[in-house]
Amino acid sequence: MASPRTPVSPPELPEKNFQYRQVQYWDQRYKDAADSGPYEWFGDFASFRALLEPELCPEDRILVLGCGNSALSYELFLGGFPNVTSVDYSPVVVAAMQVRYAHVPSLRWETMDVRALDFPSGSFDVVLEKGTLDAMLAGEPDPWNVSSEGVHTVDQVLSEVSRLLVPGGRFISMTSAGPHFRIRHYAQSRYDWSLRHTTYSSGFHFHFYIMHKGRALSVSQLALGAQILSSPSPPASPCFLQDSDNEDFLSAIQL
């Protein structure tokens, strides 16, 4: 059974990439979300299901960060994972999702800033994010040199994720950002998790990071994490990806 949907029209794009970080842009973009179909960043559930499901248990308490109008939470419910809480800082889209999935009472929708989540510590077994960090870093002028503000923003989110996970919990991040950009953010010992990376494809080549709370990072990962405010060495042929022909902000946030 597929999620309820109508044909998806091209989204309203911002004039500048940094506007992806502004709630006003998302409120405007989602003003008709209750009547429009889901929009999926970095592939739909089917494209990464084989990677995600082995990390989940039916009884897991799952938190989805920056849910937007994605069908991910509903697809998790259909896949046998009913206990899903989804947050977004746009009250417009949260209200729309509450209406769209009112027939599924186990799905909860909350308006929250992912940098300061209003849940007790240890509330979740799994935290998922798909493109949320990418959007929060949109507008960074140089993907090889993340600003101190950008580093702080990511740290705020990851610190909250670590706080909310139970021992043995999993944080899963789906993104356009390759390891040479993203590992240095994730590989911080204070988060108390291990880190594994793989890829999946949905027309484009995307990255899938899995972190297990209570396990250790490798020595090489810790070394990369120590370089968080320095520039990584660029690969021989950097490849900047787009999520679609319309949304090209990813070319500026390979982080």
From Swiss-Prot:
EC number: 2.1.1.-
Domain of life: Eukaryota
Free-text function comment from the UniProt entry: Protein-lysine methyltransferase that efficiently catalyzes three successive methylations on 'Lys-36' in eukaryotic translation elongation factor 1 alpha (EEF1A1 or EEF1A2).
Residues with Phosphotyrosine modification: 39
Cross-referenced Pfam families: Methyltransf_11 (PF08241)
Gene Ontology terms, MF aspect: methyltransferase activity; protein-lysine N-methyltransferase activity
Name used for this protein in its record: EEF1A lysine methyltransferase 4
Entry similarity comment: Belongs to the methyltransferase superfamily.
Chain ranges for the short sequence motif Required for methyltransferase activity as given in the UniProt record: 129-134
Gene Ontology BP term (one): methylation
Ribosomal protein listed as a keyword: no
Keyword vocabulary terms for this entry: Methyltransferase, Phosphoprotein, S-adenosyl-L-methionine, Transferase
Coiled coil: none
Binding site for S-adenosyl-L-methionine: 26, 30, 41, 66, 88-89, 113-114, 130
Recorded catalytic activity of this chain's protein: L-lysyl-[protein] + S-adenosyl-L-methionine = N(6)-methyl-L-lysyl-[protein] + S-adenosyl-L-homocysteine + H(+); N(6)-methyl-L-lysyl-[protein] + S-adenosyl-L-methionine = N(6),N(6)-dimethyl-L-lysyl-[protein] + S-adenosyl-L-homocysteine + H(+); N(6),N(6)-dimethyl-L-lysyl-[protein] + S-adenosyl-L-methionine = N(6),N(6),N(6)-trimethyl-L-lysyl-[protein] + S-adenosyl-L-homocysteine + H(+)
Top-level class of the enzyme under EC nomenclature: transferase
